[in-house]
């Protein structure tokens, strides 16, 4: 999305029901701990942050304690209420809590119930706020007296949504689709990795990953089958498909509005909603024709009932009302989060400190050295450079490196190697085929580039990553009108060159798909190596390193994974 697009998307924000709880909270008089009221003394609650957000969850916890209640874990004896986001579903809540069923006497309630209690100053009835149980679970004993009523059609009350939120007010949105509607999601327990990890992360299943990228959940493997996916199953993986075969987006008029919301939740740090929207967006982009009905939307893997309602609202009215209720903070948070070195948490901190524009931040804000550089070159960093400029930057680094040793290999990776016409930054990978001569080149090269005036600012002078050395900085080509550009220089041993080349070429989606596929084969893929016979625990976390496989070229990585080789231009997912 255009960095300025979200600012244009939210010129004004209408009052929403979510504002009511903020006003209600403002009316609650501050008291000393010893003076805390006891009207929540019978409440022993656990607040689940997923969807609610950590900052808002902590605010809930403070108010519970302030009014005499107790905060505990979901597994604690005597827990009475487990408070979840109002768009959470029953099975997903249990899965995130890692509970086979609710503890005896506990109720699973929506956060709007707690907001209403705090607004009215009393414990209100949970009817209409309890999460409905899946039909197959109704024969199991459940402590919530309203569970069956809530699951019956038409019995939930349509109450005003009230939320207890920090400034900026937390906006309501659709969560990732309920797993009860997609049985195949529960079959895959293998997890994909975060882009910056070593390839081991238990948060997102490979099934979720494929739906996120292609809109299609994988076919569950046969119970007696081997670990290797069948050829037809491989076709479902992004890494097995050329990006040139991306499906035509027949639902652009829907996805462009959902993308605005996804971006809004992302800059607010609400990763669960952002992920839910991302999965739905990619599912819609991959659908083979324009969506025309609610039933058709519900039939698409990755689209839940609530998301289908949003799709129909856009189809029927050409608009999505949620866009009118996004917090005023969103364009400011995006403005701040575009500063290099500032993530969503830092952007939120600056917003809460009262900053609303870059000028105020520059004159009054407390910035790290890296953030100050990012702010100084704010416009240059956001401006994508033409491919020809990226080639000049690579050539400058290569000439300087080969002046020390002509045998050094220097390759520009990222979007440049994938053949894109514009690039956000330049990543130059350096190695030597003899496996030794790359040593010592790192510092000499940086000194040379600084003396030439090519490097203007250092963001991270040296980042050690195993045997790899990485420099993150700013460069500028000589000549009038040249802009400052982001440049990363990575020196790697030749034994890791192929995996590093694959990793730094990307795209990020393609890499995640490769690593998730490796996991299904009992392997582990990172920027350092491809390993086989990797030992993992029941949660999918790697507990044994396995055996490093020989990968002299990228083609060997694909071959070990049973994939056809994809040229860099075919990896642009």
UniProtKB/Swiss-Prot annotation:
Residues 263-277, 343-346, 464-503 are annotated as: DNA-binding. SUPFAM superfamilies: BRCT domain (SSF52113), DNA polymerase beta, N-terminal domain-like (SSF47802), Nucleotidyltransferase (SSF81301), PsbU/PolX domain-like (SSF81585). Its cofactor is Mn(2+). The active site is at 310 (schiff-base intermediate with dna). Its EC number is 2.7.7.7, 4.2.99.-. CDD domains: BRCT_polymerase_lambda, NT_POLXc. It is found in: Nucleus. One of its GO terms (molecular function) is DNA-directed DNA polymerase activity. Residues 418-427 are annotated as: Involved in primer binding. Its main location: nucleus. Residues 126-204, 214-233 are annotated as: Disordered. It catalyses: DNA(n) + a 2'-deoxyribonucleoside 5'-triphosphate = DNA(n+1) + diphosphate. GO terms for cellular component: nucleoplasm; site of double-strand break. Pfam families: DNA_pol_B_palm (PF14792), DNA_pol_B_thumb (PF14791), DNA_pol_lambd_f (PF10391), HHH_8 (PF14716). The keyword DNA damage applies. Keywords: DNA damage, DNA repair, DNA replication, DNA synthesis, DNA-binding, DNA-directed DNA polymerase, Lyase, Manganese, Metal-binding, Nucleotidyltransferase, Nucleus, Transferase. DCTP binds at residues 384, 415-418, 424-427, 511. Residues 35-131 form the BRCT domain. Interacts with PCNA. Interacts with PAXX; promoting POLL recruitment to double-strand breaks (DSBs) and stimulation of the end-filling activity of POLL. Interacts with XRCC4; promoting POLL recruitment to double-strand breaks (DSBs) and stimulation of the end-filling activity of POLL. Interacts with NHEJ1/XLF; promoting POLL recruitment to double-strand breaks (DSBs) and stimulation of the end-filling activity of POLL. Belongs to the DNA polymerase type-X family. DNA polymerase that functions in several pathways of DNA repair. Involved in base excision repair (BER) responsible for repair of lesions that give rise to abasic (AP) sites in DNA. Also contributes to DNA double-strand break repair by non-homologous end joining and homologous recombination. Has both template-dependent and template-independent (terminal transferase) DNA polymerase activities. Also has a 5'-deoxyribose-5-phosphate lyase (dRP lyase) activity. This is DNA polymerase lambda. It comes from Mus musculus (Mouse).
């Amino acid at each position: 999305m255009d960095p300025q697009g979200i600012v244009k998307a939210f010129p004004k924000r209408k009052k929403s029901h979510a504002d009511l709880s903020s006003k209600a909270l403002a009316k609650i008089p501050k008291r000393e701990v010893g003076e805390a009221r006891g009207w929540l003394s019978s409440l022993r609650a656990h607040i689940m942050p997923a969807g609610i957000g950590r900052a808002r969850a902590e605010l809930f916890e403070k108010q519970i304690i302030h009014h005499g209640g107790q905060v505990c874990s979901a597994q604690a004896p005597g827990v009475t209420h487990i408070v979840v986001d109002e768009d959470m579903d029953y099975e997903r809540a249990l899965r995130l809590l890692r509970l086979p069923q609710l503890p005896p006497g506990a109720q699973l309630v929506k956060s709007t119930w707690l907001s209403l209690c705090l607004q009215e100053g009393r414990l209100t009835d949970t009817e209409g706020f309890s999460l409905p149980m899946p039909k197959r679970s109704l024969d199991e004993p459940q402590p919530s007296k309203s569970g069956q009523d809530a699951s019956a059609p038409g019995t939930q009350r349509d109450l005003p949504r009230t939320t207890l939120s920090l400034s900026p007010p937390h906006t309501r949105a659709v969560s990732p689709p309920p797993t009860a509607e997609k049985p195949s999601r529960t079959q895959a327990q293998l997890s994909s990795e975060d882009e910056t990890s070593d390839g081991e992360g238990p948060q997102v299943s490979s099934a979720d990953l494929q739906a996120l990228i292609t809109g299609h959940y994988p076919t569950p493997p046969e119970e007696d089958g081997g670990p290797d996916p069948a050829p037809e199953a491989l076709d479902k993986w992004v890494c097995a498909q050329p990006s040139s075969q991306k499906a035509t987006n027949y639902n652009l008029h829907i996805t462009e509005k959902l993308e605005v919301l996804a971006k809004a939740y992302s800059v607010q740090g609400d990763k669960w909603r952002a992920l839910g929207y991302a999965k739905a967006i990619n599912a819609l982009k991959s659908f083979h024709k324009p969506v025309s009905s609610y039933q058709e939307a519900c039939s698409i893997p990755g689209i839940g009932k609530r998301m289908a309602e949003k799709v129909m609202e856009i189809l029927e009215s050409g608009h999505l009302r949620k866009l009118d209720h996004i917090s005023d903070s969103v364009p400011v948070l995006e403005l701040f989060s575009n500063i290099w070195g500032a993530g969503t948490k830092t952007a939120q901190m600056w917003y809460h400190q009262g900053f609303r524009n870059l000028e105020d931040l520059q004159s009054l804000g407390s910035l790290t050295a890296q953030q100050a550089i990012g702010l100084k070159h704010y416009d240059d960093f956001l401006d994508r450079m033409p491919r020809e400029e990226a080639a000049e930057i690579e050539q400058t680094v290569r000439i300087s490196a080969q002046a020390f040793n002509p045998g050094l290999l220097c390759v520009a990776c990222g979007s440049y190697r994938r053949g894109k016409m514009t690039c956000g930054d330049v990543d130059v990978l350096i190695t030597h085929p003899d496996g030794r001569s790359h040593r010592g080149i790192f510092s000499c090269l940086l000194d040379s580039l600084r003396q030439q005036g090519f490097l203007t600012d250092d963001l991270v002078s040296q980042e050690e990553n195993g045997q790899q050395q990485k420099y993150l900085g700013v460069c500028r080509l000589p000549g009038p009108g040249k802009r400052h550009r982001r440049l990363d220089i990575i020196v790697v041993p030749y034994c890791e060159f192929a995996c590093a080349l694959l990793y730094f070429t990307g795209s990020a989606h393609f890499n995640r798909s490769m690593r998730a596929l490796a996991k299904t084969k009992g392997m582990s893929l990172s920027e350092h190596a491809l390993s086989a016979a990797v030992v993992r625990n029941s949660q999918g976390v790697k507990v044994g390193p396995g055996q490093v496989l020989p990968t002299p070229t990228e083609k060997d990585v694909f071959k070990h994974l049973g994939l056809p080789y994809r040229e860099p231009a075919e990896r642009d997912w």
